[in-house]
């Protein structure tokens, strides 16, 4: 996945939003469902096709509707992209929402949206294990592949980080606990005052 911010335009309407450069299997790995159209194909990625799947809120903001948009053209970073799908609403929070995202082939992202000094660079990889017992093995295999592709010797430390959903949940729980203690402290001070 390669992510960035860019302006998406349809006619006179535009929105600054997250652009996600992804592979053709992203929708399967993340369980991203579509209400209309289809996700792009391996051929679209290979050919650096200018195709896009819009989040429903982004589609609504740009066009005033979430349907009948397949085949229309939006501009991302002033390049035309043909709409091939509309994602199903997932909801979000006040800070971010996948419903405002646009998904394009990672190769189109590298070529047209985020020209990079390091070719084929990515921000992060999403890897899905076959089952919960395979997670550690999948992470070890991914680590081996990344170390080899980064040409790291056995004495060199990793130049990347790896996390799994357990790690993310643990961090979220720690933050929640800290906030709970902080709010309890504020409440106690308020009662004293």
Residue ranges of each PLM-predicted region?
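Peri-transmembrane interface segments
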Residues: 126, 134-135, 142, 153-185, ...
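Glycine-rich active-site/cofactor-binding loop and its immediate structural neighborhood
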Residues: 192
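Mid-to-C-terminal secondary-structure elements
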Residues: 13, 20, 24-40, 48-153
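Membrane-proximal extracellular/periplasmic loop immediately following the first transmembrane helix
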Residues: 1-5, 121
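A short acidic, helix-capping loop that chelates divalent metal ions and anchors anionic groups
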Residues: 6-10, 91-95, 170-172
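Alpha-helix capping/helix-boundary segments
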Residues: 4-5, 58-59, 167-168
């Amino acid at each position: 996945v390669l992510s960035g911010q860019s302006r998406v335009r349809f006619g006179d309407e535009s929105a600054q939003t997250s652009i996600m450069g992804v592979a053709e299997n992203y929708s399967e790995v993340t369980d991203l469902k579509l209400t209309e159209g289809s996700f792009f194909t391996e051929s679209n990625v290979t050919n650096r096709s200018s195709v896009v799947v819009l989040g429903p809120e982004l589609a609504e903001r740009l066009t005033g509707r979430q349907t009948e948009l397949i085949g229309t053209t939006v501009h991302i970073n002033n390049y035309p992209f043909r709409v091939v799908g509309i994602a199903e609403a997932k909801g979000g929070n006040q800070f971010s929402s996948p419903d405002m995202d646009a998904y394009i082939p990672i190769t189109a992202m590298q070529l047209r949206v985020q020209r990079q000094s390091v070719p084929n660079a990515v921000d992060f990889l999403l890897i899905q294990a076959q089952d919960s017992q395979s997670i550690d093995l999948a992470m070890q295999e991914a680590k081996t592949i990344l170390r080899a592709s980064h040409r790291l010797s056995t004495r060199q430390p990793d130049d990347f980080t790896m996390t799994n959903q357990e790690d993310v949940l643990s961090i979220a729980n720690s933050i929640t606990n800290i906030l709970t203690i902080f709010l309890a402290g504020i409440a106690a001070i308020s009662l004293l005052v």
